[in-house]
Amino acid sequence: SLCGLNCGLCPMFLNKNCPGCGGGEGNQSCKIARCSMEHGSVQYCFQCSEHPCEKYDHIDDFDSFITHRRRKADLEKARHSGVEAYNAEQIEKVKILDIFLSNYNDGRKKTLFCIAVNLLELQELQAVLWEIEHNSDIEMLTLKEKSAYIARLLKDVAATKNIDLKLRKKK
Protein backbone atom coordinates (compact mmCIF):
# COMPACT_ATOMS: atom_id res chain seq x y z
CA SER A 1 0.00 0.00 0.00
CA LEU A 2 0.96 3.65 -0.11
CA CYS A 3 2.06 3.79 3.49
CA GLY A 4 4.04 0.57 3.76
CA LEU A 5 1.28 -1.74 4.97
CA ASN A 6 1.02 -4.86 2.84
CA CYS A 7 -2.59 -5.30 1.78
CA GLY A 8 -2.10 -8.87 0.56
CA LEU A 9 -1.01 -9.84 4.08
CA CYS A 10 -3.87 -8.09 5.87
CA PRO A 11 -6.78 -10.05 7.40
CA MET A 12 -9.28 -7.27 6.57
CA PHE A 13 -8.24 -7.26 2.91
CA LEU A 14 -8.23 -11.08 2.77
CA ASN A 15 -11.76 -11.13 4.23
CA LYS A 16 -12.86 -8.63 1.55
CA ASN A 17 -13.69 -6.05 4.25
CA CYS A 18 -11.30 -3.51 2.73
CA PRO A 19 -10.64 -2.63 -0.92
CA GLY A 20 -7.13 -1.44 -0.13
CA CYS A 21 -6.00 2.10 -0.75
CA GLY A 22 -6.31 1.53 -4.48
CA GLY A 23 -10.05 1.02 -4.06
CA GLY A 24 -10.83 4.30 -5.76
CA GLU A 25 -12.59 7.51 -4.84
CA GLY A 26 -14.76 7.20 -1.75
CA ASN A 27 -12.78 4.35 -0.20
CA GLN A 28 -10.21 6.60 1.41
CA SER A 29 -10.99 6.68 5.11
CA CYS A 30 -7.22 6.57 5.53
CA LYS A 31 -5.57 9.99 5.75
CA ILE A 32 -2.53 8.73 3.83
CA ALA A 33 -4.65 7.42 0.93
CA ARG A 34 -6.46 10.77 0.75
CA CYS A 35 -3.12 12.57 0.89
CA SER A 36 -1.83 10.51 -2.04
CA MET A 37 -4.82 11.51 -4.14
CA GLU A 38 -4.10 15.15 -3.27
CA HIS A 39 -0.44 14.73 -4.29
CA GLY A 40 -0.79 13.20 -7.74
CA SER A 41 -1.77 9.67 -6.69
CA VAL A 42 1.77 8.48 -5.96
CA GLN A 43 2.09 4.70 -5.76
CA TYR A 44 4.16 4.82 -2.55
CA CYS A 45 4.56 7.70 -0.12
CA PHE A 46 8.34 7.77 -0.57
CA GLN A 47 7.69 8.94 -4.15
CA CYS A 48 6.09 12.14 -2.84
CA SER A 49 8.26 15.26 -2.72
CA GLU A 50 6.99 15.96 0.82
CA HIS A 51 7.94 12.53 2.24
CA PRO A 52 8.54 12.03 5.08
CA CYS A 53 5.87 14.29 6.46
CA GLU A 54 4.13 14.66 9.81
CA LYS A 55 1.77 11.81 8.90
CA TYR A 56 4.72 9.49 9.51
CA ASP A 57 5.36 10.65 13.06
CA HIS A 58 4.75 7.58 15.28
CA ILE A 59 3.35 5.57 12.33
CA ASP A 60 5.03 2.34 13.50
CA ASP A 61 4.16 2.71 17.20
CA PHE A 62 0.92 0.72 17.35
CA ASP A 63 -0.97 -1.84 15.27
CA SER A 64 -4.56 -2.01 14.13
CA PHE A 65 -5.88 -5.25 12.60
CA ILE A 66 -2.52 -5.52 10.78
CA THR A 67 0.95 -4.96 12.17
CA HIS A 68 2.40 -1.51 11.56
CA ARG A 69 5.90 -2.38 12.80
CA ARG A 70 7.61 -2.48 9.41
CA ARG A 71 5.94 0.37 7.55
CA LYS A 72 8.95 2.67 7.46
CA ALA A 73 11.36 -0.21 6.88
CA ASP A 74 9.22 -1.63 4.07
CA LEU A 75 8.94 1.76 2.37
CA GLU A 76 12.72 2.11 2.59
CA LYS A 77 13.15 -1.39 1.18
CA ALA A 78 10.88 -0.52 -1.77
CA ARG A 79 12.75 2.73 -2.33
CA HIS A 80 16.17 1.07 -2.10
CA SER A 81 15.56 -2.15 -4.05
CA GLY A 82 12.97 -0.74 -6.42
CA VAL A 83 9.21 -1.06 -6.50
CA GLU A 84 9.28 -4.00 -8.93
CA ALA A 85 11.62 -6.09 -6.75
CA TYR A 86 9.74 -5.12 -3.60
CA ASN A 87 6.38 -6.06 -5.12
CA ALA A 88 7.80 -9.38 -6.37
CA GLU A 89 8.86 -10.19 -2.81
CA GLN A 90 5.42 -9.26 -1.49
CA ILE A 91 3.78 -11.52 -4.09
CA GLU A 92 5.91 -14.42 -2.83
CA LYS A 93 4.91 -13.62 0.76
CA VAL A 94 1.23 -13.57 -0.25
CA LYS A 95 1.65 -17.03 -1.81
CA ILE A 96 3.21 -18.37 1.38
CA LEU A 97 0.45 -16.83 3.50
CA ASP A 98 -2.12 -18.44 1.22
CA ILE A 99 -0.49 -21.84 1.77
CA PHE A 100 -0.53 -21.33 5.54
CA LEU A 101 -4.17 -20.20 5.56
CA SER A 102 -5.45 -22.77 3.05
CA ASN A 103 -3.71 -25.80 4.50
CA TYR A 104 -2.85 -25.12 8.13
CA ASN A 105 -5.31 -22.64 9.63
CA ASP A 106 -7.55 -24.21 12.25
CA GLY A 107 -9.70 -21.07 12.31
CA ARG A 108 -7.68 -19.51 15.12
CA LYS A 109 -4.33 -18.69 13.51
CA LYS A 110 -5.12 -16.21 10.73
CA THR A 111 -3.86 -13.17 12.64
CA LEU A 112 -0.71 -14.97 13.78
CA PHE A 113 0.05 -16.15 10.24
CA CYS A 114 -0.56 -12.65 8.82
CA ILE A 115 1.72 -11.05 11.42
CA ALA A 116 4.46 -13.64 10.92
CA VAL A 117 4.46 -13.29 7.13
CA ASN A 118 4.55 -9.50 7.52
CA LEU A 119 7.44 -9.42 9.99
CA LEU A 120 9.67 -12.31 8.95
CA GLU A 121 11.98 -12.16 5.95
CA LEU A 122 11.04 -14.05 2.80
CA GLN A 123 14.00 -16.43 3.18
CA GLU A 124 12.90 -17.31 6.72
CA LEU A 125 9.37 -18.02 5.54
CA GLN A 126 10.69 -20.15 2.69
CA ALA A 127 12.78 -22.13 5.20
CA VAL A 128 9.68 -22.74 7.34
CA LEU A 129 7.75 -23.83 4.26
CA TRP A 130 10.60 -26.17 3.25
CA GLU A 131 10.57 -27.71 6.73
CA ILE A 132 6.81 -28.26 6.51
CA GLU A 133 7.01 -29.79 3.04
CA HIS A 134 9.80 -32.16 4.10
CA ASN A 135 8.13 -33.35 7.28
CA SER A 136 6.55 -36.66 6.27
CA ASP A 137 4.75 -36.95 9.62
CA ILE A 138 2.65 -33.81 9.07
CA GLU A 139 -0.01 -35.68 7.09
CA MET A 140 -0.81 -37.78 10.15
CA LEU A 141 -1.65 -34.70 12.22
CA THR A 142 -5.11 -33.24 12.67
CA LEU A 143 -5.71 -29.73 11.34
CA LYS A 144 -5.49 -28.37 14.87
CA GLU A 145 -2.14 -30.11 15.38
CA LYS A 146 -0.84 -28.92 12.00
CA SER A 147 -1.86 -25.38 12.84
CA ALA A 148 -0.09 -25.52 16.21
CA TYR A 149 3.02 -26.99 14.54
CA ILE A 150 3.20 -24.19 11.95
CA ALA A 151 2.57 -21.57 14.64
CA ARG A 152 5.41 -23.04 16.71
CA LEU A 153 7.80 -22.99 13.73
CA LEU A 154 6.97 -19.35 13.01
CA LYS A 155 7.25 -18.34 16.67
CA ASP A 156 10.62 -20.10 16.94
CA VAL A 157 12.00 -18.15 13.97
CA ALA A 158 10.55 -14.92 15.34
CA ALA A 159 12.09 -15.57 18.77
CA THR A 160 15.58 -15.75 17.25
CA LYS A 161 15.06 -12.15 16.10
CA ASN A 162 13.24 -10.94 19.24
CA ILE A 163 10.02 -10.49 17.28
CA ASP A 164 6.73 -10.85 19.14
CA LEU A 165 4.01 -12.21 16.86
CA LYS A 166 1.21 -10.29 18.57
CA LEU A 167 -0.51 -7.06 17.63
CA ARG A 168 0.49 -4.04 19.71
CA LYS A 169 -2.61 -2.16 20.81
CA LYS A 170 -2.62 1.51 21.71
CA LYS A 171 -2.93 1.95 25.47
Residue ranges: model-predicted function:
Residues 1-171:
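Cysteine-centered metal-binding/redox modules
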